[in-house]
Regions:
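Beta-strand-turn-beta hairpins that frame and shape the catalytic cleft
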Residues: 1, 132-135, 192-197
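N-terminal beta1-alpha1 cap of cysteine-dependent amidohydrolase-like domains
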Residues: 1-85, 93-99, 105-111, 118, ...
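Active-site-proximal beta-strand elements of phosphoester/diester hydrolases
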Residues: 3-4, 137-141, 198-201
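Short, glycine-/Ser/Thr-/acidic-enriched flexible segments
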Residues: 10-11, 52, 145, 170, ...
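Structured helix-beta-strand junction loops
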Residues: 78-79, 159-161, 193
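N-terminal Rossmann-like NAD(P)+-binding domain of SDR-like oxidoreductases, especially those catalyzing
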Residues: 88
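Pocket-forming structural segment of enzyme catalytic cores
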Residues: 97-184
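A glycine-centered loop/beta-turn motif at secondary-structure junctions
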Residues: 187-211
Length: 232
């Protein structure tokens, strides 16, 4: 199996994702420049966090027009796995690969902190090695992480089990106090209908080593690799 990490001007978590895949998952991984369009040699693509194009206009609004994104759409449509983290989640929403939008945080401040997220669904390629209902500790770092969607979209996400992560307290309770940005229903991550595209605002790639305060994100990447290994 082989992973690709897309790099936009302004990406700053690309090396973190690369490090996790190469060191903790133990699989080959390449950086993919945003002007490149050939994804044929990859089994999974990661769109990392950062500030693509300086977040001008709004987060992800310009990155969606990069040449690589048409290839990402085709890659996902073929059933391949796409993971968007933080700015990557924003880009996936802007590109129409995930519904809804991520707007300014409720308090209009950039938030950089550790949060807890509850695993809502383990029936996905990204979460099958996680425990449903468990609370994972991961860092966040964003100014536009407030997930919004209309009522019909929310009902669909809820009804189809596509809300994958919710912000919670350390006991797994989804309280308002545990919601760092005002996201609807404490939503921290969602997937598409086919469940092969996942976007989340917390940074699992920054929670893979105890030295950094948490290794709770490691199993997400191992789930992803396990899915690919089973399909090989």
């Amino acid at each position: 199996m082989k992973f690709g990490v897309i790099v936009f001007p302004g990406s700053n978590c690309d090396h973190d994702a690369y490090h996790v895949i190469s060191k903790h998952v133990g699989q080959p991984v390449d950086f993919i420049w945003h002007r490149d369009t050939d994804l044929s040699s990859y089994d999974a693509v990661i769109i990392p966090g950062g500030f693509s194009y300086g977040d001008y206009l709004r987060a992800g609004a310009l990155a969606r027009f990069s040449p690589v994104m048409n290839s990402v759409k085709a890659f996902a449509a073929s059933g391949n796995l796409v993971l968007g983290i933080c700015n990557g989640f924003q880009i996936l929403c802007e590109a129409g690969l995930l519904p809804g939008a991520l707007i300014r945080n409720r308090d209009l401040h950039f938030v950089c902190d550790y949060v807890n997220v509850r695993v809502e669904n383990t029936d996905t390629p990204f979460t099958h090695e996680l425990k449903a209902g468990s609370a994972l500790q991961m860092p966040i770092a964003h100014a536009e992480g407030n997930y919004v969607c209309d009522d019909a979209t929310f009902a669909e996400l809820q009804g189809q089990g596509r809300i994958i992560f919710r912000y919670c307290d350390r006991n797994g309770e989804t309280t308002d106090a545990a919601n760092p940005n005002g996201s609807r229903d404490n939503i921290a991550g969602i997937c598409n209908r086919e469940r092969n595209v996942l976007g989340l605002m917390p940074h699992p790639e920054r929670a893979c080593e105890d030295l950094l305060g948490s290794s709770d994100g490691r199993e997400l990447f191992r789930s992803l690799a396990g899915t690919l290994a089973a399909a090989a």
